[in-house]
């Protein structure tokens, strides 16, 4: 049975841990609010570009672009967004598990796909399994700007344009609510799902639709990567906030249990002392 000193040390240690997890929960909540605001403010930009592209694609003019056309798939590119740090519950593991399942189901060899890893945790897990990582990016800030990922986003789009890849997907955790984040696979290229986009305005283009399309499509594809990153950041902070909240609750329960054990042990020790005193007094009579 643990001594009173041991139990007291465990109580103090758990209280310190609780202070840390509570602080991390509050920090994550603040970062979540900022990330949500940033992700929401970026949506109108991507929505408007998508509307313009859809308007051109649906027009009667004879315009075309490789990014709008499907071709036989020989190689697939995957952009995988995870976090640099842990303590976020199953945020990273669920995504990597889903990605590996899809890759094993979709491809027969490593020559059929390549991975762009954003985030240290995912990169390390994928490297451990010796998967083909073409490019990686770690150390992004909690509130990343487009310039932070411009190079890797442009690289993925350029490799599709150069037909290194015939299709490009992005994997990330989509923010649903502070307690729910969904592993999501979104097709970035080719853009074949524009028909369901509502076009609310009639546009006139200068110099012509083809020139506008060639300028907008790469920007739109790159913006999809950045938008997914902002969404993933919000999901990361939500997952970490939830994980730290659960850890704080567990610490509270453990402190209650240890305090009860301490009081019982202390009561038993006092009872034992009284018994010994009474027994000693009786022996002297």
From Swiss-Prot:
Entry GO MF terms: ATP binding; proton-transporting ATP synthase activity, rotational mechanism
Topology class, membrane: Peripheral membrane protein
SUPFAM superfamilies reported in the protein's UniProt record: ATP synthase (F1-ATPase), gamma subunit (SSF52943)
Chief site of localization: membrane
GO biological process: proton motive force-driven plasma membrane ATP synthesis
Keyword Ion transport: yes
Localization: Cell membrane
Gene Ontology, cellular component aspect: plasma membrane; proton-transporting ATP synthase complex
Keywords attached to this entry: ATP synthesis, Cell membrane, CF(1), Hydrogen ion transport, Ion transport, Membrane, Transport
InterPro entries: ATP_synth_F1_ATPase_gsu, ATP_synth_F1_gsu, ATP_synth_F1_gsu_CS
Function: Produces ATP from ADP in the presence of a proton gradient across the membrane. The gamma chain is believed to be important in regulating ATPase activity and the flow of protons through the CF(0) complex.
PANTHER family: ATP SYNTHASE GAMMA CHAIN (PTHR11693), ATP SYNTHASE SUBUNIT GAMMA, MITOCHONDRIAL (PTHR11693:SF22)
Family note: Belongs to the ATPase gamma chain family.
Subunit note: F-type ATPases have 2 components, CF(1) - the catalytic core - and CF(0) - the membrane proton channel. CF(1) has five subunits: alpha(3), beta(3), gamma(1), delta(1), epsilon(1). CF(0) has three main subunits: a, b and c.
Protein name: ATP synthase gamma chain
